[in-house]
Amino acid sequence: RMLPSGGTAATGAASGRETWNRLVEVIRAFFQKKHIWYYVAFIILYRLAEGFVMKIVPLFLKAERSVGGLGLGEQEIGLYYGTYGAAAFVLGSLLAGYYISHRGLSRTLFSLCCVFNLPFLAYTLLAIYQPENGMLIGSAIVLEYFGYGFGFVGLTLFMMQQVAPGKHQMAHYAFASGIMNLGVMLPGSI
């Protein structure tokens, strides 16, 4: 057997009204959790800066140097993101799991948040100095993905351990994941 059974399914709703009542119960239970508004704010703010970076960095990498960009071609960007970035993301995720398992989430969450946001400093330095060295630019992108992998594990575990526990844990985790994505999407609407 490859997949876990997941337990037994709840009985199906008999009517639309019953389904609606269950949904309201799940949402009400979510917002009645102790400290939930702090958790929601934390989740949104954790990824807010990333939302800005996701919109701007591709433009910054492609823009000509004369207008403040780095003037990279599609192949270079693809290599940095698709190959080196993907490997760095996996490595960051694995190391974060190891780090958290040895120290605990409460003792590591602040450092995970710092590592998650460290790449934004690297992009600031790239914008100021506009290096031409591909290794330096690639290193900043690798740092971004490593930090993203490292920090994202912390946020995921935070949602699993602090937000999800309770009667409707799967629904509450899914709801927290949606809130997390809101933190990334809000900057796009600005």
Question: What residues fall within each predicted segment?
Answer:
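A late C-terminal transmembrane helix in Major Facilitator Superfamily
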Residues: 166-190
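Juxtamembrane intracellular "pre-TM" segments in multi-pass secondary transporters
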Residues: 6-40
